[in-house]
Amino acid sequence: MMGVKSANAQALNVAGSTFVYPIMNKWIQRYHELHPGVSINYQAIGSGAGIAQYKSGTVDFGASDVPLDNKELATMPRPTLNILDVSGAIVLCYNVRGIGPGLHLSGPVIADIYLGRITKWNDPRIEKLNPYLHLPAEPIRVMHRSDASGTSYIFTSYLASVSKAWKDGPGVGKSPNWPVGIGAQGNPGVAGLIRHAEGSFGYIELAYALQNHMPAAVVENRSGNFVAASIQTTAFAVNSAVKRMEKDIRVSIVNGPGVNTYPICGFSYLIVPKFPANAAHGKAMVDFLKWTMTDEAQRMAADLLYAPLPESIRKINLKIIDTIKVR
């Protein structure tokens, strides 16, 4: 749990995504410096739990890496909007003795690891992609999320796009029925498992890999190129979605087009009330949402390797924010 407070502060409570927590933490600290009269408490409890808390009315707004679809919006107790905040990459990190950054993996190989079909690091399919590495004959210790996770939703969306067996089997979801592996709570939990378990392999948001100095795989994209996750390679995925977002900001950018596009990317969203019940909280929320779309806020996101939203998407987002009615 994280928050900043001051005397007589207007306090907002927010809960959800661990994917967005690193930048949300920085944003909240900076926003409090600019607006000492506003404090924001963010609970990084996972997208599913954040949506549940928003639905129950225990937080002012939620954070999820999966936007609410029309059916979910209809179940909310109050009119609700999806607001974009950042985009980022999900990386496959590993802890294999003697193997540093740059392990090459393809989508079908990643899917088969998570399906339990590839179980050893020296499997011929992994060796074929990495002819210059000496891979050990050790078990792959698969790690995944144990909570309802937007990061898992993005990752399983990718797996379904590259593997018919995954699409027809576990499928896409925040809490899929994982065929193999050990689960942990949140991105920090999975990162911790990978760091401390030799032979481990798992998916986390790029900022967590950076913070924990963990090597990440270079992944084959739709064009057949092996691409490392970065601000630029994530931005290629984001830019490919701009036209689609003019109609609806709820778009997938996994396995996107482009020779240099990193294939496992996604947006993160804030789940907000269209008619905030508390006028003071509503005004503070709207002001904060607008600030996240500023150049300063998006530059801060880039410092943590999230891809800043291009101006065209920020304009679309600001139009949605302007529909929030504070009584």
Language-model segment annotations:
Residues G3-R327:
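Flexible loop/hinge segments at secondary-structure junctions
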